[in-house]
Design a protein with these regions (language model features):
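Positively charged, helix-rich recognition surfaces that bind polyanionic ligands
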Residues: 1-162
Length: 162
């Protein structure tokens, strides 16, 4: 939880704005501001390292989709949420840690229609838009959650590539 760090960063930003530029008090406040900024960044880095280590240590095969992060930033709804996290950094950590621990890391192409393909029968529903979160396969009548179905398909694709 980074609420305390965010609160302190905002506090020192306001304080810096009120002080005379490059005065002694300004320099002291600037040091405190950077201290809290570093503390926040260290907590984030630590969380990424813990998560990536957990994933790599507990799974022998790690399959991830190569996400179009630049395209996600163009979406007005997702951009503010994505600015707070660094998916690229997390993926890079998982990649190099999987080499350290001699685990298999497979990255699936971003254009693979993982959420459009039924994980039960293989039917591909082409008219599936991004706002549809659940859908029923017309072929086998299986009800799918978009994200869970995509995860199953990514795993199947990774196992095929082995």
């Amino acid at each position: 939880d980074l609420t305390h760090e965010d609160k302190m960063i905002r506090k020192y930003q306001r304080k810096l704005n009120r002080q005379k530029y490059m005065s002694n008090n300004y320099k002291k406040t600037l040091q405190k501001y950077y201290k809290w900024l570093n503390r926040k960044n260290n907590k984030i880095q630590n969380a990424y390292h813990q998560l990536s280590k957990y994933i790599v240590k507990n799974y022998d095969i790690i399959a991830m989709e190569d996400l179009n992060i630049k395209g996600m930033f163009k979406n007005k709804r997702w951009a503010p949420k994505l600015q707070k996290i660094s998916l690229y950094k997390l993926v890079q950590m998982i990649k190099y840690k999987s080499k350290w621990y001699e685990k298999t890391f497979i990255q699936i192409n971003r254009f693979y229609p993982s959420s459009q393909i039924c994980s039960e029968c293989g039917y591909q529903k082409h008219d599936l838009t991004i706002d549809i979160r659940e859908w029923t396969c017309p072929s086998c009548k299986t009800k799918h959650n978009r994200d869970i179905n995509a995860a199953k398909n990514i795993l199947q694709k990774a196992l095929q590539e082995l």
